A protein has these predicted regions:
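Nudix hydrolase/Nudix homology domain
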Residues: 1-43, 55, 99-102, 149, ...
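Short, charged/polar, Gly/Pro-enriched secondary-structure boundary elements
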Residues: 11, 70-72, 160-161
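N-terminal strand-loop-strand
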Residues: 44, 55-104, 108, 130-131, ...
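Short cysteine-rich loop/turn motifs with clustered Cys
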Residues: 47-50
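An acidic- and aromatic-residue-enriched active-site/binding cleft used to recognize and process polar
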Residues: 95-96, 139-141
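The catalytic Nudix box helix
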Residues: 104-137, 152
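Long C-terminal interaction/binding lobes of large macromolecular proteins
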Residues: 132-137, 158, 175-178, 183
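Active-site-adjacent beta-strand/loop module that shapes the phosphate/pyrophosphate-binding cleft
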Residues: 140-163, 173
């Protein structure tokens, strides 16, 4: 962990040449190092007794006076493709906080919610569309935010928005695969 911090300091000096954690998000070693460093910076006190935590040498477990293990926080999130009913188009979103780029719909899983229901809810809240044929396709750690992204595909019969949205998106757009290269997409490693 100490070596990773030294490396992080060096990388900051040369970030335009080597990128940042998002650039290397698919590298498991980078994802793990970023997640563990993030945990040590953000989880400082024992939730059981308020004492300062001491992390083990691997940076994977901390303990305070209570002796109970404290682990890095991982926030489950859903992300995925929404296809029209015949699968010929996908729905992309332009987020209000990152206008000018298109990406997939995504959001966090709420307490007590299964991931499939989280996907349905996020699509409904952000796009005002109902989805079905929800299929889990894989996961990826998202160390810069502490998330574990759970990827899905789904279909909708709702070509147009049928419900109110939460305002997170500027707008949505149906596209065919051959149109993707002409769109301003979010860079790899970002939403």
């Amino acid at each position: 962990v100490f070596a990773a911090r030294l490396l992080d300091t060096s990388v900051t000096q040369f970030s335009s040449q080597v990128g940042d954690a998002r650039t290397h998000a698919t590298d498991p070693g980078v994802a793990r190092a970023v997640a563990l460093l993030r945990a040590q910076e953000q989880i400082v006190f024992d939730p059981a007794d308020g004492s300062r935590l001491t992390w083990d040498n691997a940076g994977t477990t901390a303990r305070g006076r209570s002796g109970r293990p404290v682990f890095p926080r991982i926030d489950p999130a859903v992300i995925g493709l929404i296809q029209n009913s015949d699968g010929s188009q996908i729905l992309l979103a332009e987020h209000a906080r990152r206008s000018g780029f298109f990406s997939c719909v995504a959001g966090y899983v709420e307490a007590g919610e299964c991931v499939e229901d989280a996907w349905r809810r996020e699509v409904w809240e952000e796009t005002g569309r109902r989805v079905y044929d929800i299929v889990y396709v894989g996961s990826q750690p998202w160390p810069t935010t502490g998330a574990l992204m759970l990827g899905f595909t789904s279909r909708t019969d709702d070509v147009e928005q049928v419900g109110e949205t939460d305002g997170e998106l500027v707008h949505t757009r149906w596209v065919q695969r051959d149109q993707l290269s002409s769109l301003p997409l979010a860079r790899e490693g970002s939403l």
